[in-house]
Amino acid sequence: MDKFLKEFKDRGYFYQCTNENELSKLINKEKIKGYIGFDCTAESLHVGSLLQIMCLRLLQKYGHRPIVLLGGGTTRIGDPSGKDKTRRILTEKEIDKNTKNIEKILKKVLNNDDPKTKPIFVNNYSWLKNLNYISFLREIGKHFTINKMLTFESVKTRLDREQSLSYMEFNYMILQAYDFLELNKKENCSLQIGGSDQWGNIVNGTELIKRYSSKQAYGLTTPVSYTHLTLPTICSV
């Protein structure tokens, strides 16, 4: 096992991986780029973001380059994961302010000294805002089936409880998968890291990349509950 994944597990960060053996081989062979997406629904980060930040720092520690994806576009829709009702739709001004604040915070806590591991900051609004709906359905939508989308926890839970799920929210998982595809094409990003509640969305991304370009990409998730971790374990990277 490579040193990155070993420490990832030793620290208790590990929950699931789409193809652990192949990811380990890739990391042993070359330096990679991995990304984590951050929601921009609030002016600042919450305590749950701490583990994700440490994952980015761990990538840097072993010579890999992290990509911070700011969800300026997807925040305009709202992630239904873990929610039993539709999120409040924020104004454009609120989202832009939140995005700038979160980027400022993350630039302070990540290592910017080494140009090889310096974080790359992207905002998915830059590519989502100009999507052509017909082209998107033809090129991307054809790779998703309603049958499978209905099995994901974020959707299934709402429907089982007979709670409404808007068409807007239903599209969130497709857009997140598309984010991974865009980063794979533009930055050669081969890894997405996220909380275990994002597993379905992350798997969608790896599968979309495989179908669209026949390239291999990987997903790695962390526990949503951090009760098994101590603060020094999380923060000492």
What is the predicted role of each segment?
Residues 220-229:
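Active-site and channel-lining beta-strand-loop segments
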Residues 22-80, 192-201, 205:
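N-terminal catalytic cores of NTP/NDP-binding nucleotidyl/phosphoryl-transfer enzymes
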Residues 11, 91-92, 98, 108-221:
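Divalent-metal (Mg2+/Mn2+/Ca2+)-assisted nucleotide/phosphate chemistry catalytic cores
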Residues 8, 46, 121:
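Divalent metal-coordination and catalytic microenvironments
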Residues 80-96:
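A charged helix-plus-loop insertion that forms the helical arch/lid used to bind
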Residues 1-40, 216:
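Non-catalytic terminal extensions that flank enzyme cores
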Residues 228, 233-237:
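Single conserved hydrophobic/aromatic residue that forms the stacking wall/gate
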